[in-house]
Amino acid sequence: DSPLRKQEGGYSAHTYGSGDKQVKVILLDGRYFREPLQRVDGVYQPNQTGTFLGEAQWRWLEKELTNSKAAVHVIGCGIQFIPEEQRFEKWANFPQARRRFFDLLAKTKPPGVVLLSGDRHIGEISRYQPDGMPYPIHEVTSSGLTHAATQNTSEANQHRIGPIVNQLNFGLLEIDWSQPKPQVNLQIRGKENAVFVSEKVSF
C-alpha cells in the first residue's frame, strides 16, 4: 500500500517533530532515472549532460525545499554529493546535475541542510560552500557496518574535514535544540561507540 508504488523512482520525504523543532528527512533516488555511467579503462568519466534524478524528482525536490517549515533538512542519497576526486560512483560523475543540486539549495535556502551518503566502505565528513548559499554544506559519508576498505589510507578529497575512516563505522547526527538555532553534532563512530570524527555545525 506504499504510495511509492504509485510513482516512478523510490524517493520520499518524512517530517519529524513539531513547531520550531521539525526535522525533514529527504531521501533521493539516484539510480532509477540515472543515465548509464561512462567508463574509460574501467574508470568512471564525467557525463556533462547526463540525466541523474529525472525531471519529476527535481520538481518534487524543489517543492519539498521551498518554504519548508523544518529547522533541519537531512538529505540522503546512496552516493556522495560533495567529493569530486574519488573514482567510484558520485554526483560529480554528472557535473551538470551536481551544479543543479547545489544551485537549487542556493535558490530555496532551506535552513540546516546536512547531506548523508554511503556505499564507499569508508567514513568521512566533507564541507562545501555553494555559491549563493548563506552557510557551508556538510556531508556525512558512512559505510559500512560489516565491510571496510582498510587499505584506503590516502584517498584525495579536497572537501574532507578530519581524517578518512577506513574501519567499520556508522554515522550519527545529534541535534541540540537548546540553542537559539539548532546545533548539529556530526559524528562517525565505530566499534564500542568509538568516535572517529566529530564536527559541530550551527546554522
Where are these regions (language model features)?
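Long, structured stretches of catalytic cores involved in phosphate-ester chemistry, encompassing
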Residues: D1-F203
